[in-house]
Amino acid sequence: MVIKPVVGSGSSGVQMCRTVDEVAEHTRHLLGGGHMWQARPRILVEEFAQGQYLTADMMGGCLVGIGTGHFGPPPHFVYREYSYPALLSNDESARIADVSLSCLRALGLGWGPANIEFRWTKRGPVVIEVNPRLAGTPDPELIQLAYGVDLVDEHIKLVIGEECDLRARHSRTASARFLAPDRDGMLEVIEGASRAAAIPGVAEVKMYVHPHTPIVRKGDYRDLIGHVIAASPSRDQTAALLQQAVDLVNWTITPFGPKGG
């Protein structure tokens, strides 16, 4: 099962638990002062839905796009890659759209942006979360690259009473790969980011940290140190561009010395 805070974002405090002992341990961590709460401490206990992760981006009750994502190793849920559009059949896309609209109607969320997370299981699409807001970075950037729709601009239009235009201007594949360190320590050097950014088809290479930053992994989005975004007319080409760029970005982390040493 999955234990997570009722209120939060970015996978903070979210953990898969396979045994009763793991459930008890993570619950004690969340409620015993180990988690920074944004609201009154309450936890959710959910069945883990096994299957492809999907996200539906909505605006004013209209489906703009469906993306897919991959995570790092359990028990945490740290994003490693995001892509638009998800590789789905027409029937599968229609089911995601239908369930998304049903969620919005049930919750009274007909206006403005919404981001709905799914797992496609053996039972079909299972709703994980319904978020009444735009998805965080880099989803809006990927949607703009994939479909030519700027969700931030279209949201502003809704706010000021103008009509938004959600029609796709083009059809491309856009993907983001997140850069995650494999150890704790002092980040000494980052190399190759400018060379990666110069590759045609690479839209962005962004580092979240600078050299001489201590790295202490927490099992959530704060573990990530950067991302690379690429887009092209085909899925295979985008994947190749992304890998080429990621291979150029290198960093060095020196493990922390013994405490008190």
Language model feature labels by segment:
Residues 15, 47, 144, 225-232:
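Short, well-ordered beta-strand elements within core beta-sheets of diverse protein domains
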Residues 5-8, 76-77, 218-223:
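Short, flexible turn/loop "capping" segments at secondary-structure junctions
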Residues 143-153:
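Gly/Ser/Thr-rich active-site loops/lids in small-molecule metabolic enzymes
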Residues 18-22, 61, 124, 163, ...:
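Short loop segments at secondary-structure junctions
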Residues 156-261:
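Peripheral (often C-terminal) accessory segments that flank ATP-dependent C-N-forming ligase machineries
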Residues 10-11, 39, 50-52, 62-63, ...:
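A generic structural signal for well-ordered coil/turn residues at beta-strand boundaries
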Residues 1-2, 8-13, 18-44:
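N-terminal beta-alpha lobe that positions the nucleotide/phosphoryl donor
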Residues 30-35, 39-42, 47-86, 94-127, ...:
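Phosphate-binding core of ATP-grasp and ATP-grasp-like enzymes
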